[in-house]
Swiss-Prot record:
It is found in: Secreted. InterPro entries: Avidin (IPR005469), Avidin-like_CS (IPR017889), Avidin-like_sf (IPR036896), Avidin/str (IPR005468), Avidin/Streptavidin-rel (IPR051764). Biotin binds at residues 67, 78, 116, 132, 144. This is Streptavidin. Belongs to the avidin/streptavidin family.
Length: 183
């Protein structure tokens, strides 16, 4: 009887040891793994006019970072915050996301904000396709013209000077109020 009890204890301890080793391995813990969308979204992105969007995608669906406009009178970087679908569909659809930049920093206050809403599409040529709304503070009488609408495509490849020039000549607009005011 004593040998059976000792054998049972030994088997139990071995099982506990194997279970503890398996759960100590972070690659086995789904919470420790970074989602493909999270890993793909995090980084530095550029739009067709050369503006820079630096973002970190959190496991909880948060987007944080900075936006630096390449056009208009914007100076330095502006804080951005947003959200993305941290559990996106697995059917090949894009990952829904959106973020906002209030055009106020230590250098300027344009009394406006831009929101981008779109989809992250991963792969070899990852991109973020967005539509944006730029709303500026106005008088009640001018409220009808307070919001501009446009679109941006962001990639992780910085555009060349020639492609930026071509986009400008094609009339591509942007979500920067400091540029819109001058137009």
């Amino acid at each position: 009887m004593r040998k059976i009890v000792v054998a049972a204890i030994a088997v139990s301890l071995t099982t506990v040891s194997i279970t503890a080793s398996a759960s100590a391995d972070p690659s086995k813990d789904s919470k420790a793994q970074v989602s493909a969308a999270e890993a793909g979204i995090t980084g530095t992105w550029y739009n067709q006019l050369g503006s820079t969007f630096i973002v970190t995608a959190g496991a909880d669906g948060a987007l944080t970072g900075t936006y630096e406009s390449a056009v208009g009178n914007a100076e330095s970087r502006y804080v951005l915050t947003g959200r993305y679908d941290s559990a996106p569909a697995t059917d090949g659809s894009g990952t829904a996301l959106g973020w906002t930049v209030a055009w106020k920093n230590n250098y300027r206050n344009a009394h406006s904000a831009t929101t981008w809403s779109g989809q992250y599409v991963g792969g070899a040529e990852a991109r973020i396709n967005t539509q944006w709304l730029l709303t500026s503070g106005t008088t009640e009488a001018n409220a009808w013209k307070s919001t501009l609408v446009g679109h941006d495509t962001f990639t992780k490849v910085k555009p060349s000077a020639a492609s930026i020039d071509a986009a400008k000549k094609a009339g591509v607009n942007n979500g920067n109020p400091l540029d819109a005011v001058q137009q």
